[in-house]
Curated annotation (Swiss-Prot):
Cofactor(s) named in the record: NH4(+); K(+)
Annotated Gene Ontology cellular component terms: cytoplasm
Gene3D superfamilies associated with the record: 3.30.420.40
Protein name as annotated: Type III pantothenate kinase
Organism in which the protein naturally occurs: Fervidobacterium nodosum (strain ATCC 35602 / DSM 5306 / Rt17-B1)
Taxonomic classification: Bacteria, Thermotogati, Thermotogota, Thermotogae, Thermotogales
Binding site for K(+): D126
Alphabetically ordered keywords of this record: ATP-binding, Coenzyme A biosynthesis, Cytoplasm, Kinase, Metal-binding, Nucleotide-binding, Potassium, Transferase
GO terms, molecular function: ATP binding; metal ion binding; pantothenate kinase activity
EC number: 2.7.1.33
Length: 252
């Protein structure tokens, strides 16, 4: 049994896994916990104390300040082992970028799982606080793209202006808005989907054979209707499991 934490800027996904199969998955606010005891109490309310005690912890985090919380948690309530995902600790893939250590752990997990399950040629689009596009070509990670996420753009308009409202993160059916809300949704959601389609189409030209396009993250379903590909909501979590398996086997 493993306890997985996918720590994002806004939300944390926590899941239990046995032999790579995910179950009892929850999405909580990243601001919900600031100490190992707060984290334990919160998890106990979800899983029960005996379930989460004495097992290994795997963490994919883009919030480095919380790493110490997971270290203390693993030592106090787990088996003392916490595995932090990093590209520099996974050598089954060549990371052909300038600074591999800077690559976000969530993106590392996405690439690992895509390589394991979909093959050597993949474009992975992850819709979180930021939208990331990652390029796997011939089994080599070639780099990618970072864009503002849907909610981030909507919040920027709301906070940066005096009169624009905070609108729902939802695509608009059309490209000419008749009111302020539809104008904002077109200018943020629809326009970003168009940008993603443009970027993916141009990246695809770099391949000799069509790559597998994978959508993951909270708003993946919005874009799949416009940018062809498969939706895989648990891609990051399974990448964490594969990372753990590699680390465990290399330590044997």
């Amino acid at each position: 049994m493993l306890l997985l934490f996918d720590v994002g800027n806004t939300h944390t996904t926590v899941a239990l896994t046995r032999d790579g199969k995910m179950f009892e998955k929850y999405r909580i606010s990243t601001k919900k916990y600031e100490t190992e005891d707060e984290l334990y109490v919160f998890l106990k309310s979800l899983y029960g104390g005996t379930v989460i005690e004495g097992i290994a912890t795997v963490v994919s985090s883009v919030v480095p300040s919380l790493n110490i919380v997971f270290e203390y948690f693993a030592n106090k309530y787990g088996d003392g082992n916490v595995y932090f995902v990093s590209s520099t600790d996974y050598n089954k893939i060549v990371w052909n970028i300038n600074y591999p250590k800077e690559l976000g752990a969530d993106r590392v997990c996405d690439v690992i799982a895509a390589y394991k399950e979909y093959g050597k040629d993949c474009i992975i689009i992850d819709y979180g606080t930021a939208i990331t596009i990652d390029v796997l070509k011939d089994g080599v990670y070639e780099g990618g793209v970072i864009m503002p996420g849907f909610a981030m753009m909507i919040n920027a308009l709301f906070k940066g202006t005096a009169k624009l409202p905070l609108v729902e993160v939802k695509p608009y059916d059309g490209f000419i808005g008749k009111d302020t809300e539809s104008n904002i949704r077109i200018g943020t959601i629809n326009a970003t989907v168009g940008a993603i389609k443009y970027v993916v189409e141009n990246i695809t030209k770099e391949y000799n054979t069509p790559p597998v396009i994978i959508h993951t993250g909270g708003h993946a379903l919005y874009v799949q209707k416009i940018v062809d590909g498969v939706v895989d909501r648990d891609l990051t979590l399974r990448g964490m499991y594969y990372f753990y398996e590699e680390k465990k086997n290399s330590a044997c």
